[in-house]
Amino acid sequence: LLGIEAVRPGGHIGDIGEAIQSYAESERCSVVRDFCGHGVGKLFHDAPNILHYGRRGEGAEMKPGMIFTIEPMINLGRPHVKILNDGWTAVTRDRTLSAQYEHTLGVTEDGYEVFTHSPGGLDTPGIAFEREPASAE
């Protein structure tokens, strides 16, 4: 979740992308470039686009009150995807595994606030595998 940790007033949108890309590539993964996060404002998919790759210091400056999503897709193989005939489903072209997460957050005066926390803790890495399955009562 290094992309989230890059959110701060005075930072730039490229800081988020650089954090995600540099970590993914250090783990021999790739970042899909066909999709991006987005601002949440008068429109749900509003400006600015939040790229999950990039260079620190580039892009719009983050300011308190900005609300946006960070939602990278990380592939074990190459970054290329294709959309299936249903017009919605994205798969990797090289048939490798891919993972995606999405959080909505806001820039605060001194950092950020994540708005998409799970009350049950399911947003914590690894938690889905550590919990016992819910009973089917």
Please give the residue ranges for each predicted region.
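Active-site neighborhoods and metal-handling regions in enzymes and metal-associated proteins
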Residues: 1-137
